[in-house]
Design a protein with these regions (language model features):
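Surface-exposed molecular-recognition determinants
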Residues: 44, 50, 54, 71-73, ...
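Serine/threonine-rich low-complexity intrinsically disordered regions
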Residues: 3, 41, 53, 86, ...
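Short, surface-exposed, charged/polar-biased interaction segments
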Residues: 28, 32-35, 39, 79-86, ...
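Aromatic-anchored, charged helix-turn/loop surface patch used as a conserved interaction hotspot
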Residues: 1-70, 78
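A general "mature secreted/periplasmic domain" signal
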Residues: 8-11, 17-21, 83-90, 97-100, ...
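Residue-level signal for secondary-structure boundary elements
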Residues: 19, 23-26, 70-73, 82, ...
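Amphipathic protein-protein interaction modules
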Residues: 59-108
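Helix-rich interaction surfaces within compact, conserved domain-sized segments
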Residues: 97-135
Length: 135
């Protein structure tokens, strides 16, 4: 059985690999991430149509968890983002993200900020004495 801490480590690793693939795809299509994309530019259109295989792997990994484990992961992430207690985040997110698809989508949307969010969220949970696998 994978613990929440182990899952977060794996999620972070998958996200870092996905970020490298994003950079490679941007480079292949001549996109300068500092300048952003012109939505209607043919290079930007081609780039948006590319699939990041590592994003797919991350989504598959997340979908392999039950919803309660995903809620813990999501709550830790949002606690690190918002600075609110992890348990409060979990309870609030349960209302606004009622389905597993909602939870996976919102976790995926924060991929570029995982390291900072999870670092702060894990530190806060530790300071609050929260058991990551049972809260």
């Amino acid at each position: 059985m994978t613990t929440v801490a182990q899952a977060i480590d794996r999620i972070r690793g998958l996200a870092q690999t996905a970020a490298r693939v994003d950079a490679e795809l941007d480079k292949r299509h001549g996109i300068d991430p500092k300048l952003g994309m012109n939505y209607f530019d043919p290079k930007s259109i081609a780039r948006r149509q590319e699939t990041n295989s590592e994003d797919v792997k991350l989504a598959q990994y997340l979908n392999g968890f039950d919803i309660e484990t995903l809620r813990r992961i999501e709550a830790l992430m949002y606690s690190g983002r918002n600075g609110t207690p992890t348990i409060d985040e979990r309870d609030d997110l349960r209302k606004t993200h009622p389905t597993k698809d909602d939870v996976v989508r919102t976790i995926m949307e924060k991929r570029v900020s995982f390291d900072a969010y999870f670092d702060r969220g894990l530190d806060r949970a530790k300071a609050d004495g929260i058991d990551l696998d049972t809260f």
